Design a protein with these regions (language model features):
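C-terminal helical "lid" of AAA+/P-loop NTPase domains
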Residues: 150-151, 159-167
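Walker A/P-loop NTP-binding motif of AAA+ ATPase domains
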Residues: 1-147
Length: 167
């Protein structure tokens, strides 16, 4: 499970893992699976079957609705229950991303082999991100300019930097 603010590298982690293993990444948006328990179960089983056929790594992006801590909402509880039941019998490598790690159901969290939390980059890390992405994009930018941008916008994520360099 990969948790953190948007743009901090969760999806990139799954992409890099799949590439390093020489496997395809099957990225699934939660909106594709539905929120009704019976629809979710069928859709998840289809996705896992595809991963098996393709030997793919699965990324379930923004999985918050399926991993949310159970409470008084019976439908939500059923969704989490279906998700748990389907996961229990799968062998595929699955990356789940969430922006709300504090709300993850304990039963889901206990089934995750690894849980990584991503923070907004520190100013020093942000400067390194600027340098690396600018160099990869062939954009000439001085270290002085990078320091000035970081000083004025210390909460930018890697995705923010990437998008700004496209301007």
């Amino acid at each position: 499970m990969l948790a953190g603010a948007p743009g901090t590298g969760k999806t990139l982690t799954a992409e890099v893992y799949a590439e390093s293993e020489g496997r395809a990444l099957y990225s699934v948006q939660c909106s594709q699976l539905g929120v009704q328990p019976e629809d979710l179960e069928k859709a998840l089983l289809r996705c896992f079957a595809r991963c098996g056929r393709w030997n793919a790594v699965m990324l379930l992006d923004e999985a918050d609705v399926y991993v949310h801590r159970r409470g008084d909402d019976l439908t939500q509880n059923a969704v989490v229950g279906v998700f748990l039941r389907v996961l229990e019998y799968q062998s595929a490598v699955l990356f789940l991303t969430t922006n709300r790690a504090e709300d993850v159901d304990d039963a889901i969290a206990s089934r995750c082999i690894a849980r990584l939390t991503y923070a907004v980059p520190s100013p020093a890390d942000q400067a390194r991100i600027w340098r690396i992405l600018a160099d990869l994009s062939g954009i000439r930018i001085t270290d002085r300019t990078i320091r000035a941008v970081v000083a004025r916008s210390p909460a930018l994520t890697g995705r923010d930097v990437k998008n700004l360099l496209k301007l």
